[in-house]
Regions:
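A contiguous loop/helix-start segment that scaffolds small-molecule binding in enzyme catalytic cores
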Residues: 6-8, 76-166, 304, 308
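Short alpha-helix immediately C-terminal to the canonical SAM-binding loop
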Residues: 222-223, 291
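Class I S-adenosyl-L-methionine
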Residues: 1-35, 44, 209-216, 226, ...
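C-terminal substrate-binding/active-site "lid" region of AdoMet-derived donor-dependent transferases
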Residues: 268-332
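Conserved class I S-adenosyl-L-methionine
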Residues: 186-195
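Class I SAM-dependent methyltransferase SAM-binding "motif I" and its flanking Rossmann-like core
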Residues: 13-77, 245, 255, 299-320, ...
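Short beta->alpha hinge that forms the Motif I/post-I loop of the SAM-binding pocket
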Residues: 216-221, 286
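Conserved SAM-binding loop of SAM-dependent methyltransferases across substrates and taxa
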Residues: 196-208
Length: 336
């Protein structure tokens, strides 16, 4: 901005609008004032070296970002092209793959592509020991063992994948809750009373660049939430210490809000006021007191009100029977 009116040239590698400086400049300066001259990107060069179709590959960057975010992309038969931070990144990613039962995955480090010192290193995640140059792009072909962790991006991860004190939105209820929150690319969720963060984590996994803020007054539960976010590939979960509604002051307006506990009229009014147009609100109630509040709000605002009860097969002596969980009353609506 200080140089406005003069011709300024910014040199960037590859395509400046693909995980590069061009996007940041475009947010600070009107794109009408900028002329971009893209060259071959690291992704294009890497795909050509590997013989992979770009249409069938997930591209991501961990350059200057938490490397754990690639965990969410570990899927059987998935091909990944990853911009790394440096020489240690491939070893870290090999460790993530091996820990999750993907040790047979094929890794290829492509260093200094297009230059005089171009080099290639091939190996399996479980035996990766190469010392590679710092300027590299990593190609991964994910190969799952029989005991591999199956972590789909759709909501409904197994409860045992989450650290916690037992107070959490359980698997089947969580799946319906996140579905009704409608995760979308780049959208922001407030998880009010987030506990171990299971809903926020599933929301962030379900859509690329989805964001979430978890509001939780208990330090131990915030620790659980942070650990779960890291382990499940969404390390950018933001956690706020505080009580609702005061903790909501000055937060960015959300596209969706989940209230899993501690419902009150004051909490609802603060959330509803902050929710953006076309925003989604989902509230789960277990107690009679919370259910009564939901009934009153439903009568005033409409939406969808459902009761969900899950029963699971359990051994009863030598036979098997159904053991029901506590019913959950779920209210969802869209702000129009």
């Amino acid at each position: 901005r200080a140089l406005r009116g003069r011709t300024v040239v910014v040199l960037a590698t590859g395509d400046p609008l693909w995980f590069s400086i061009g996007a940041r400049i475009g947010r600070a300066i009107d794109p009408v004032e900028i002329t971009y001259h893209p060259q071959l990107s690291a992704f294009q060069l890497a795909a050509a070296r590997m013989g992979w179709s770009m249409a069938d590959v997930e591209t991501l960057t961990v350059h200057g970002r938490p490397v754990e975010q690639m965990i969410a992309f570990i899927q059987p038969n998935q091909r990944l092209l990853i911009l790394t931070t440096g020489a240690e990144t491939p070893k870290q990613i090999a460790g993530f793959l091996t820990e999750r039962g993907f040790g047979k995955s094929q890794l290829t480090v492509l260093a200094s592509m297009g230059g005089e010192n171009e080099a290639r290193f091939d190996g399996k995640a479980e035996t990766w020991q190469y010392e590679v140059p710092a300027f590299n792009t990593l190609a991964v072909e994910c190969i799952a063992a029989k005991d591999a962790a199956m972590l789909p991006r759709v909501p409904g991860l197994a409860d045992e994948l989450f650290q916690g004190d037992g107070t959490m939105t359980k698997q089947e209820i969580r799946a319906t809750s996140v579905a009704k929150l409608m995760p979308m690319r780049g959208a922001l969720l407030w998880d009010v009373g987030c506990g171990c963060g299971s809903v926020a984590v599933e929301w962030m996994r379900a859509a690329r660049y989805a964001r979430a803020i978890g509001i939780e007054p208990r330090a131990d539960r915030r620790t659980y939430a942070a650990n779960n976010a890291l382990a499940l590939g969404v390390p950018k979960l933001e956690l706020i210490d505080g009580f609702v509604p005061s903790a909501l002051n000055d937060l960015e307006s959300p596209d969706a809000i989940f209230i899993g506990g501690g419902l009150s009229i004051e909490t609802f009014e603060a959330c509803w006021s902050a929710l953006r147009p076309l925003g989604r609100l989902v509230v789960n109630a277990v107690t009679l007191e919370s259910e009564q509040i939901l009934l009153n709000l439903y009568a005033k605002y409409g939406g969808d009100l459902v009761r969900i009860q899950i029963s699971k097969a359990n051994s009863i002596g030598k036979v098997t029977g159904w053991r029901p969980s506590m019913p959950v009353t779920q209210w969802s609506l869209v702000k129009r």
